[in-house]
């Protein structure tokens, strides 16, 4: 990062293939380097309520670009805006497609109660889910939703992470 008179004026980039350094200058520099969802220290600083959340982030999401920019005095904007997903399988971190909510799945808590409008934004649905007993929910849907979302079979059913029944009563009995 090139600093001039207390401001970011550009960056120097190294081409690993040939060792050539190129300088890029601009009147405004925006660093878009990825997130920090796997960096517990940064989560504790900016979003401590997410420290115990199950994450779908890959382990490399450490926020190094943000830390480098901050180290030279760059400002950060909206750093607390971390994308969260309400339909993450809790023991494996596998993400259940948001398409299932759009197709008609409902979320119920461990007591079998629906607690939100599933079509609200991710952050709103996630916040409602965290308020439930245990901070998680079941996604309940019919055969039509199942048939339209092939990832359910591949990611969940084959791994023994999905429950299935012919009636709601039968499904509820399995959830106990």
Predicted regions and their residues:
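Gly/Ser/Thr-rich helix-start
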Residues: 11, 35-38, 103-105, 113
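Glycine-rich loop(s) and the adjacent beta-strand/alpha-helix scaffold that form part
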Residues: 20, 24-89, 94
